[in-house]
Amino acid sequence: MALLALGACATPFNADVSRFQELPAPQGQTFAIRAANPANAGGIEFGQYAALVAQELQKVGYVPASGDTADMTVSLDYAVDAGKERDILRRDPFYDPYWGFGSFYRPYIVRTRRGARYVMGFYDPFLYSGFNRPYDVDSFTVYTANLDLKIDRNGDGKRLFEGKAEAKSRSNKLPYLVPNLVEAMFTGFPGNGGETVRISVAPEEKR
């Protein structure tokens, strides 16, 4: 999967959304939302995310109901991983006499606070010299967040919808990630079965 937007607010939130569906056309069918992870059941945070999903389902014509009487059960799950650290090597042409004059592209070693590592970039003979190095290594953490949504028909237990939205971000804050993943999931809902699409959610306007 390609690396998606890394900024939390400055750039659009990009998510890859996969959906498989056999949903009937909305005709007032009722639904109830439950936590796929029992640890989230009854939680205030889960309730806020479930409310966002309910709003989206109502927009397309479904009606919320209690779990005992609903036509469909919507299972909601979400998570963000521990993240992976990435390094970006920045080069300043003002301090590099070889910038654009015969430098050649190959992997080389730089030393970071986590030890030596290979970095792809332009080789410079002054990299290990006593002069000021024209390179700087930026380190940051990339987190992968996902949202899983399933809809089952209560009468016979038939699976009607399976959807997954996944995004990479420099933020690991669920209150930021989950609402964006919900919006991505319901963009063009229910979608074409078996299709994975890239959804961009515009960043919030600064006030």
Where do the language-model regions lie?
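Soluble non-cytosolic domains of exported or imported proteins
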Residues: 40-51, 68, 172-180
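Short secondary-structure boundary motifs at beta->alpha junctions and helix caps
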Residues: 133-139, 146-148, 155-192
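Surface-exposed patches in mature extracellular/periplasmic domains of secreted proteins
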Residues: 60-71, 192-201
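Acidic helix-start/capping segments at beta-turn-to-alpha-helix junctions
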Residues: 67-85, 202-206
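Envelope-exposed proteins and targeting segments
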Residues: 27-29, 60, 70-74, 143-148, ...
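Acidic/histidine-rich, surface-exposed loop or edge segments in extracytoplasmic proteins
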Residues: 27-40
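Bacterial Sec signal peptide processing site at the extreme N-terminus
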Residues: 3-27
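Low-complexity, compositionally biased segments in intrinsically disordered regions
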Residues: 82-144, 148
